[in-house]
Amino acid sequence: MSGLILNILVIGDVGNVFKTISKYVKNSKIHIINFPKDGAGIYTYDENYELFENYKVSDQVKKINQIKENFDLAVVMGTGERIAYLADLNYVSYYVGRDIDAPRFIKNSKESWYNEPLHRLNFFERRFYKKTFDFAIAHIAPTWVFEHLKKFSGNNIKMDLKPIDLTLFNDNSELHLKKNEKFTFFCPQRMGIPKGTDILWKALQFCKSDFQILQVDWRDTGTDEENSTSLRLRENLPSQVKLIPMIKRKDIPGYYHSCDAVIGNLRIGSFEYVELEAIMCKKPVISFTDKKIKICVDGKEMESPFIPNTNDPKDIAEVIDNFVVSDQFRQNIFKKEYNFVQNISDPKKAGEWWDSLFEKMIKENSSINRKSSGITVKLRMLSFLISNRLYFRKIKNYSRSA
């Protein structure tokens, strides 16, 4: 397969992961089709995606069937998995969080920090989503997410490299905003329990130094519990917190450059893209590290330098104050963080890894088409429609047009 360009179809790109990877693979050409922009997606999506025209699953499957012959392999994220299953593709599933720590195929699945289930699906729906999971030819997840993936059997692969788009996040940006007069932390992630906003608010009660936090006015709104808890956080802002409007992805580097430091996730115990982007923009980061979460690159275990190693509010407050009052403290932490991120976010190395994976998967699966029988594929769609309690008329209309 040497010398050939592999054509990869990505269905659903959560967090612009594969948009970044597409810039650094050499032996593969990645085409992404994403779900319609709405809500926060208007700001967080890259602006150069092909989009499905609507959220109707049958239309999305029809679209994929029209273009699939142009590709060698599919990669899916989130609900892209069900589209690939219904289109009978050979696909690799990549997970980034609640798509596997609270999977749809588990009854009343919920994340550990919530009491309310994320999904309340009936038996037939759960069975359908278990089939979409099992149908994948490989499952891939990074860092803390892999700890959840490995609970389920399958061709599970741990991949901790998280490449950063260096064309956007670097120290040469011309998007520098006016420098703030007061020491300023930037917090671009959503307000909510999963990001540790509740922990941060408690920590701020113990802080003694003078600073401000620019928090993006963006919060969790999924379940009733998510919505109510994030709303309480928004309505009870500590005095140090100032809300700023949502920011488009292309404009975020300017905010990194104008702040003094960045506050990342304080709950999950592992870094996300916010932490890595900030470091590549040469800003020190505060983020909780759980030492029990293992990180491996090139077969070697690495230790995350992000601090603190506890998410006790008083310990976080102490780190915040040290960041504010001591330039030497910040620089010492930043040097360790920067050296680590240079390895964990090396886009060239990540591009090589994905090129190698794509080649391996395509050698083992000669076509993007799974080549199931026509009746089997049709029954999958009917099963999906029935499990979602759709009307008989919709089922009959699909049968006539299929």
Regions found by a protein language model. Name each.
Residues P163-K182, G254:
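Acidic anion/phosphate-binding donor-loop and adjacent secondary structure
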Residues H176-K195, W201-K208, I213-L214:
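Conserved donor-binding/catalytic core segment of Leloir-type glycosyltransferases
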Residues Q212-S230, P245:
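Glycosyltransferase donor-sugar binding loop
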Residues K110-H139, F146:
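Membrane-proximal helix-turn-helix segments that form the acceptor-binding/catalytic region
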Residues V325-S367, K371-V377:
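A charged, aromatic-enriched C-terminal amphipathic alpha-helix characteristic of glycosyltransferases
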Residues P284-I293:
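Short hydrophobic beta-strand element within catalytic cores of glycosyltransferases
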Residues L266-R267:
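Aromatic "clamp/platform" in nucleotide-sugar-dependent glycosyltransferases that forms part
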Residues L86-L118:
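Active-site proximal beta-strand in glycosyltransferases
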